[in-house]
Amino acid sequence: MMRKGEMLDKALLIATNAHHGQFDKGGNPYILHPLKVMHYLKSNDEELQCMALLHDVVEDTNTTYVDLREAGISERVINALRCLTKQRGQTLGEYKDAVFSNRDAMFVKMADLRHNSDIRRLKGVTDKDLERMAKYQRFYLEIRAKLNENLS
């Protein structure tokens, strides 16, 4: 059993190393994105925080689920990451279904979409950017509706 905060320390280290040298569309160090996603979650749940920090690691770096497991990342975190990671050849519909299948993944994806919809992150805003933002907002609302359905 890990002490409180230990998995979060590991997740931050893994994410920082994995995203080293990567930059977002606005030219900012990429690690700021997962940190912001974690902040948007406004949760004290350490595993949810880890999911936010690691949500792009498998998709965008050479890190594998095996690496994460060996580092002591919990199965709950890894299961959510499997739903949050776009697979090669996966359609948008299939990806959404994967996210909808995991409550944790839905919360992290909402925070991710919220940060991805922040136009202040871009250097200049094109029609293509606005189209992408609209797509993100639709997905955000779909997730919110699903979470509300599950409550009733």
What are these regions (language model features)?
Residues 1-152:
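Active-site helical microenvironments for divalent-metal-assisted chemistry
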